[in-house]
């Protein structure tokens, strides 16, 4: 079949293509404006404003898609456009993208709009971008009018200290640094502590991405050091340390440390990128093994990440032969979970009905997942990719899985030829369920898992999240050993919960009763009761009481709730606190403290 017509003769085709691209350009302009505004909010230490901006940006893409669909339907009666015109629309669109700075994202926007207009039977044909049509290699912006993707610095000329200061000051952050010279010396000392001294090769240079990465209460400088054949990735988090004063907080220069800050369990960065593919290529060079789909998602282009993930899934299915199976572990009452062993993700469907004592609805569960998508996940809640109409080959589905799907979620299934189409599914990174990790672990594993579990719940509390069902099976252990929450159907805002202490029993009958002798409201939580299902294993109990003895004290939970109600936001560090310069090199901060004390005395 000849996929390219001899003549592009449709004026409507060209006009629709222009309208589609204008819709994308509006979206990306708003996307970049959000990143620029993030810098202003960071400089002003407006943390609530940054949170609001991040939430609004997540919903912005779908709003722009709806706007574009409405315009196409109103002006061109898009649903009734002939097939040959649709083919020309795509080809005109490709022509318009030849000099575009974000062609891959524009292709995804095209798909998002067209898949709402066209029937699913068109999803894999020539009318949409099943594969990229425009290469993203070697795309550059218009310098010097625009910032380069990254800047190169040469420490061999002026010395490492001067170069590092120049790197930081080139970002032109408005609040001054408390003591940038001190911070730079901390960076140099951390480099020596990690790697010792090294001879400078002729190509010794530092590459730094031109835009800051904003998330939570931090801005990250991201770069790489090149010396001979060595390539060293690094991130420098910038924090407010006092009102109106900044400081470099740490040096992250190990691959695992960078992978954690770009993890699927963190919220998306706000970062200004004229050429996103160039940023993704740079990040890919320092995050070896991280899929492009996850990198696009981590920098806020989650729809592009979602598109690439689906292409990765289809390619994996072509080059594998194992079958989808029911996920190992304890089955949930709300979600049916299955996985493809050779593919590191799980697929989650909402069941059609939930057995007692679950009292929820499909709509409420969907709402909980949307809450998590919009909320700051702090590295403790897994991101989810939400898909509609996912077609999987029946030959790749285990018989037991098909029976389970037909039993638990028949309304979500549709058979089309050799495929089973799932109407709605969530996809998450596969982790080791914490209960299995604890069950099979050594004493050291158990201590690590319990310490991480307690830290995870406490950090979620600080972020105004009450997990609801806190059984170990609802948490997973990542490949970096982090404990992450992933079961959202009972999640609530902590500020909506009524923290209560268990009233003392009124008599011996109360004390011996297996049922509560006190009233329990729908939003009441009783931290003292959690020990009954968390401390059954003696080894778990020992580690839990060693690291988190306060976990079962209602005062801890109430304190966090009060803290949030006062509008305060805590500091979060997606790296070990021992890496913070103020903790790692206290002697370098002692002089500042003496000077400050002298000034106060004067």
From Swiss-Prot:
Record GO cellular component, one term: cytoplasm
Keyword field contains Isomerase: no
Key words of the record: ATP-binding, Cytoplasm, Glyoxylate bypass, Hydrolase, Kinase, Nucleotide-binding, Protein phosphatase, Serine/threonine-protein kinase, Transferase, Tricarboxylic acid cycle
Recorded GO MF terms: [isocitrate dehydrogenase (NADP+)] kinase activity; AMP binding; ATP binding; phosphoprotein phosphatase activity; protein serine/threonine kinase activity
Pfam (any one): AceK_kinase
EC number of this enzyme: 2.7.11.5, 3.1.3.-
Catalysed reactions listed for this entry: L-seryl-[isocitrate dehydrogenase] + ATP = O-phospho-L-seryl-[isocitrate dehydrogenase] + ADP + H(+)
Entry annotation: catalytic residues: 383
Record flagged with keyword Flavoprotein: no
Residue numbers binding ATP: 327-333, 348
Location of this chain's protein in the cell: Cytoplasm
Gene Ontology biological-process annotations: glucose metabolic process; glyoxylate cycle; tricarboxylic acid cycle
HAMAP family for the chain: AceK
Function: Bifunctional enzyme which can phosphorylate or dephosphorylate isocitrate dehydrogenase (IDH) on a specific serine residue. This is a regulatory mechanism which enables bacteria to bypass the Krebs cycle via the glyoxylate shunt in response to the source of carbon. When bacteria are grown on glucose, IDH is fully active and unphosphorylated, but when grown on acetate or ethanol, the activity of IDH declines drastically concomitant with its phosphorylation.
The family this protein is said to belong to: Belongs to the AceK family.
Protein name as annotated: Isocitrate dehydrogenase kinase/phosphatase
């Amino acid at each position: 079949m000849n996929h390219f017509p001899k003549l592009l003769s449709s004026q409507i085709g060209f006009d629709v293509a222009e309208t589609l691209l204008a819709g994308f350009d509006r979206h990306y302009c708003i996307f970049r404006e959000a990143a620029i505004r993030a810098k202003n909010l960071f400089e002003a230490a407006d943390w609530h404003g940054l949170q609001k901006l991040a939430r609004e940006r997540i919903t912005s893409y779908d709003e722009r898609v709806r706007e574009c669909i409405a315009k196409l339907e109103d002006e061109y009666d898009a649903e009734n456009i002939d097939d040959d015109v649709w083919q020309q629309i795509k080809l005109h669109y490709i022509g318009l993208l030849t000099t575009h700075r974000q062609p891959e994202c524009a292709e995804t926007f095209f798909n998002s709009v067209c898949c709402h207009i066209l029937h699913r039977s068109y999803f894999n044909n020539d009318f949409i971008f099943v594969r990229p049509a425009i290469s993203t290699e070697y795309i550059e912006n218009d310098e010097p009018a625009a910032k380069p993707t990254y800047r190169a610095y040469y420490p061999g000329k002026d010395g490492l200290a001067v170069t590092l200061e120049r790197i930081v000051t080139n970002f032109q952050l408005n609040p001054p640094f408390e003591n940038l010279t001190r911070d730079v010396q901390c960076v140099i000392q951390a480099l020596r502590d990690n790697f010792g001294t090294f001879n400078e090769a002729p190509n010794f240079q530092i590459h730094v991405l031109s835009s800051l990465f904003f998330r939570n209460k931090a801005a990250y400088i991201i770069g790489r050091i090149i010396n001979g054949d060595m390539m060293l990735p690094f991130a420098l988090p910038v924090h407010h340390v006092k009102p109106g004063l900044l400081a470099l907080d740490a040096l992250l220069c190990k691959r695992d440390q960078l992978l954690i800050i770009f993890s699927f369990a963190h919220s998306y960065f706000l970062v200004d990128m004229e050429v996103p593919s160039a940023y993704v290529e740079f990040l890919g060079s320092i995050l070896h093994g991280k899929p492009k789909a996850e990198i696009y998602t981590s920098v806020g282009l989650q729809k592009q990440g979602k598109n690439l993930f689906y292409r990765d899934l289809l390619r994996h299915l072509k080059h594998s032969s194992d079958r989808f199976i029911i996920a190992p572990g304890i089955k949930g009452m709300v979600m049916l979970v299955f996985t493809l062993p050779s593919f590191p993700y799980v697929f989650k469907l909402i069941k059609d009905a939930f057995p007692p004592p679950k009292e929820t609805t499909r709509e409420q569960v969907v709402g909980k997942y949307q809450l998590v998508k919009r909320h700051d996940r702090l590295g403790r809640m897994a991101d989810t990719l939400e898909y509609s109409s996912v077609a999987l080959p029946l030959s790749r589905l285990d018989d037991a899985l098909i029976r389970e799907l037909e039993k638990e979620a028949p309304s979500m299934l549709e058979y089309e030829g050799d495929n089973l189409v799932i109407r709605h599914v969530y996809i998450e990174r596969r982790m080791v369920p914490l209960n299995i990790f604890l069950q099979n672990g050594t004493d050291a594993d158990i201590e690590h898992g319990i310490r991480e579990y307690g830290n995870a719940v406490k950090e979620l509390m600080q972020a105004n999240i009450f997990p609801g069902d806190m059984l170990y099976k609802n948490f997973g252990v990542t490949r970096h050993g982090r404990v992450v929450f992933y079961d959202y159907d009972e999640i609530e805002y902590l500020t909506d919960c009524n923290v209560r202490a268990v009233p003392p029993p009124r008599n011996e009958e109360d004390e011996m009763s297996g049922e509560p002798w006190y009233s329990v409201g729908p939003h009441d939580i009783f931290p003292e009761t959690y020990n009954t299902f968390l401390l059954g294993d003696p080894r778990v109990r020992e580690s839990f009481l060693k690291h988190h003895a306060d976990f079962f004290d209602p005062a801890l939970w109430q304190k966090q709730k009060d803290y949030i109600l006062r509008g305060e936001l805590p500091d979060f560090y997606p790296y070990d606190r021992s890496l913070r310069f103020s903790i790692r090199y206290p002697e370098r901060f002692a002089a500042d403290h003496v000077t400050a004390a002298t000034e106060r005395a004067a």
